[in-house]
Design a protein with these regions (language model features):
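N-terminal, intrinsically disordered, low-complexity segments
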Residues: 2-27
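Tandem repeat scaffolds
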Residues: 4-10, 31-212
């Protein structure tokens, strides 16, 4: 199916129910509830066994939840909705639109291929995540850990990734320019490091050695 088909398959009633169900479990006001599970999709599961929310439009922030095995590819977040202070494992956010929004807390084995994350506010830990082809221009991250993440062909123009830790990450084809990596640390194969471009590199260390 195409992006348009994933989006248009959702009718108004299905979207309203998805957001009602999410509102019942997300946020601080629902922390007292037991079994705060991410809603089930009216479309069942994908071929990969993930809960199928591809193309959904969410008006509710996914907040203070533990989410596993959900596919939110092509999802759109409207209003103030974002991914905020939650734990995501084995989730798919391919080509998701999260520009100028929060993408925070912990992400493990998640895919952000082709995602629009420009101007996003990013934290706190990403492990075994794939950002191939995503737009991270002007994104802001401070003291964030990226473990074994793939950043192939990522647009980092104007991004401010300061005091971050990149462990065994790859950056083939990634573009940095007019941003900052000040105070960040890189460990792993030096052949997998990015082309820095006109990027602030004050205090950057590679395998323990100061770069500039």
């Amino acid at each position: 199916m195409s992006k348009k088909q994933f989006i248009t398959r959702w009718d108004d009633e299905q979207l309203a129910e998805a957001n009602r169900s999410l509102a019942a479990v997300t946020g601080k006001s629902n922390l007292h509830k037991k079994d705060r599970l991410f809603p089930s999709s009216p479309f069942g599961q994908t071929a990969a066994g993930l809960e199928d929310f591809r193309g959904v439009e969410l008006t509710e922030t996914i907040q203070y939840l533990t989410v596993q095995g959900v596919d939110l590819s092509y999802a759109r977040f409207v209003g103030a909705a974002s991914l905020n202070t939650s734990t995501f494992t084995n989730c798919c956010f391919d080509r998701i639109k999260l520009d100028s929004r929060y993408v925070t807390h912990e992400f493990s084995r998640c895919s952000f291929r082709g995602a629009k994350l420009n101007n996003a506010r990013i934290s706190e830990r990403f492990e075994d995540c794939d950002f191939t082809g995503s737009n991270l221009s002007k994104a802001i991250a401070n003291d964030v850990s990226f473990i074994r993440c793939r950043f192939s062909d990522v647009n980092f123009r104007g991004a401010m990734f300061m005091h971050c830790r990149f462990e065994e990450c790859s950056f083939e084809g990634a573009v940095f320019h007019n941003g900052s990596l000040a105070g960040s640390r890189f460990t792993g194969e030096t052949g997998l490091l990015p082309v820095w471009g006109n990027t602030i590199l004050d205090g950057v260390k590679i395998n323990g050695e100061r770069l500039v």
